Each structure stands twice: as C-alpha cells, then as structure tokens.
Amino acid sequence: CELRFHPGCDQAYIEETASSISNALDTVKGDHPGSFSLFSNFESNSSFDEYQRAFTDIKMRIDCGDCYQVNLTQSFTAKGDGEPLAAYLRLRRATTAPFSAYLNWNSGALLSLSPERFLGLVDKAVLTQPIKGTRPRGSTKEADIQLAKDLLASEKDRAENLMIVDLLRNDLGRVCQIGSIEVKQLFSVESFSNVHHMVSDVSGTLKADRDALDLLTSCYPGGSITGAPKLSAMAII
C-alpha cells in the first residue's frame, strides 16, 4: 500500500492525514470487523418498462448518429444493518478486484471494488486501461477457455473497446506530450474470479507543466462508464 499526495499539499495536512490513517489502521488491526446483513432485497431505480424505453431511445439516437456508444446503467438499493467494513471484506472474499477501496465517514461509507485502472501516474508516465467486453467464467476448464476465446473474437466487443481507446487517446492528448501517446496493448483478455474482461492499455507522458489534477480533469469521467463521444453520451444519459 502506498500513500501519495499532490505536490501542492501543505506539509501539515500531509502529516495529519497520514497520522489519521495510521491511527485508524491501528484501531481495526486484529479486531473482528463485526457483521453486516441485508434485510431487504435489492431494488432498481427504474422499472423494466422504463429501462426498455431508455434502451430503445438510445438505440434510435445511435442510429441517427448522435453518438456511437452509450453506457446505460441502473442503480440498485437495499436496506442493511451492521459494520460496513464487514460488508466490504465479504465482497473482497467473493470477487477479485485489483482496484478496491473502503472509505468511511460519519455520514456513510464507500465500498468500491473495480477491475479497471482508470488512470495511473508514476512520475510523468501515464497509463489508462479501459475495459469493454465481458463474459462469465465457465463451469469447466474447457468452457472457460471457450468463453475467453469468444470474447477475444467478438467484433461487437472489439468495436466498443476501440471506441473507448480512441476516446482516451483524445483525453490524454490534451495533457500529454505530443507524440508520446501509444496503445501498448489492444484487445487483451484478463480473467478475474467471476468474469473475463477485454482490456486495452493506453500510455503517454504528461507535459512538464501539467500535474495529476490536470490529468484527472482532462479524463474524468472515464469513457468506459459514459460512452462515446463522451459529451454526447453524457447528455443522452
């Protein structure tokens, strides 16, 4: 685990934050986080008919050329009781997600498990790894291999992935050095505990006068959660 701060952060703030995190870790170290349970089923924020109408409208907008890809999603809500950390640890045991986070405030907690690297920055080296294209894991080794092959060969998933790769190349181009942006890997399949994902790698070198916040501002929100072109997709959503 590595803690990084923006270069412009005040030293006193850095020390205070690091101390708070250290104290919090000491508090939970070795302690059982308690338990967490749901006492209601998950409910969507939209009915099936509403979702179907939205899907039909988006398809029409794509046919009209207003956009190429829209990431239509829905949220689910359930009631629960217990320690949020226990829920997070249970989720971690259920699925592998290399980019996970647990943040707890007085007003609530954020439990995040993501397989996708939105942005990585080491010195001036930038890396983004968009995911588009998913298949479930197979019940047998043979079925699992075939599902991964099907994903890799899918023209639809390749097209969606390529759209987001192009979008991110454009986003990085606003803050990276000219000529530094490269697609290091295109249409790779990565396997996790529950699914196969199609992943591509896009890299670049940040301009000398730009920093991490400039990079985030240029790329947020990630194209894989909006669609392409980004602004058109967001307006439709």
List each model region and its residues:
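Extended alpha-helical targeting/anchoring segments
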Residues: C1-I237
